[in-house]
Amino acid sequence: MRVVRSFGFVDLCGFTHFTAIEGDDPATRVLAEFRRTVRDVASGRGVRVAKWLGDGAMIVGVQAGPLVVAMLEIEAIAEDARSLLPIRAGLATGPVILFEGDDYIGTPVNLAARLCDVAGPRQVLAASGLCDYCPPWVMARDRYEMAIPGFVDPVELVRLSARPPGDHPVTDPVCGLILDAAFAVAGAGADGAPAWFCSPSCASTWSERTRPVVATPDR
């Protein structure tokens, strides 16, 4: 069956070297924290961890926008936590064949994997077509063509990152991303207090969290 999906591959840079130098136990702790972050972000963004790949993961989204945000959130969490190992990621979207119910065959999944391979530390590389699905607070920088192993023609790439907060930084109270207020989604909690969000889904979650609990009278 042919479907349209978006794919992200993310992994820990330098994990093999870190394991050789620091030992198995510290490496296991770093990997456990990485996987916990990926699980939590994927669950919150409505994307799915399709498989674990040792020190990496393959993430699949029905829509491209939530996948882009998920990858940038994972990178931001790793940066804020001063993780011992930085992450890198590659993204692509397009039609693929859903094979035996749980695997995907096609150019987009292969491209996303290769982009993760060529990305540097703290880089999120994407096929340029993903720019059409990015929220306003995401910047597509360094547009260029690159020869990718396994692909006949050069691929046009961009590096995705959050816009610098500028003079009016705001923090999404749900996911913790720091955004420029001019590009954030304005909203409010159920109590009417103003707030800013990275996405309508975070705005909806905040509204639910702040909704007053109505006591049910005893009968």
What are these regions (language model features)?
Residues I21-E22, E73, W137, R209:
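Residue-level signal for well-ordered alpha-helical positions
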